[in-house]
Amino acid sequence: KYAAKISVDTSSIQYENDEVMKPEWGDDYSICCCVSATKTGQEIQLFGARANLAKTLLYAFNGGFDEKHRIQCGPKMERITSEYADYDEVIEKFDWWMDWLADIYVNVLNLIHYMHDKYYYEAAEMALINNDCERSFATGIAGFSHVVDSLSAIKYAKVKIIRDEEGITKDFEIEGDFPRYGNDDPRADELATWLLRTFFDKIRRRHTYRDSKPSTSILTITSNVVYGEATGATPDGRYAHTPVADGVSPSAGKDVNGPTAAATSVSRLDHFIVSNGTLFNQKFHPSALAGREGLEKFVALIRTFFDQKGMHMQFNVVSRETLLDAQAHPENYKHLVVRVAGYSALFT
């Protein structure tokens, strides 16, 4: 309850679930980077960039043609040419492109880690690690919720494909309703589980640098802005070149059934697969957590999420009006703290 009160007052705390961490990392683990666990003094984490699966889904529609840069980025494959997206066809092509991406992704990370060891070996840091250390090969996923929602839209609604004069998919029109990730709907959450397991299965089938143990994460930190800028419109209704959702959080504004429903959807993911970490952001207006009753409900939310085997959650407790006023008058908010990702920062 004391920690929750600090969250309400300062937005400066993140919560990690021991019961999820211990089976993989043991009792003596540390948090490295932002939210990832590591065996203290016994492990090296080889980390690299994230795989933008939202962009990969668009490659499935356009046969590897990049809708933004107007170049062929992958093998020239058959495009989806139907007026409406067919779920089975999309899944088949998307699965192929995820396999292609996993191969390139792991090979590039292998090269990065080899060159890092060759030209920037961290001798001082290595002196603090056991000789017989473990090595984890950390990968990551970006655009997660948008892919889940896109597949759900194609499966449960009708998605019309909008193409430019060259036949390249540039936008989508959705007809009908569909379940979205983050609303405690098993239909969407099953697609989320499928996506995570399918892509990670492709990662761990590849040879990794120094036979390190593959792991994955869904923790974009702030890179979701950059990945979104590089990605066209997606079938879930997200506009072209706008940020993708941060970390494992639902798409912005689409978790309409409340924080408990969003937390339940996130907790349904197999966090022993995504062992390198998930980053789950939630935002509250201060009035929602005011007083003793508000604080007790807040504590109950955190405990319930962890009881459901969720891994990580953090909160921004600040009003929109405060943030807008801080933008306009930063001199009045020199001590305003916001939770960015796995770290806090002064807003101004």
Outline where the language-model segments fall.
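Conserved catalytic cores of very large enzyme subunits
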Residues: 1-348
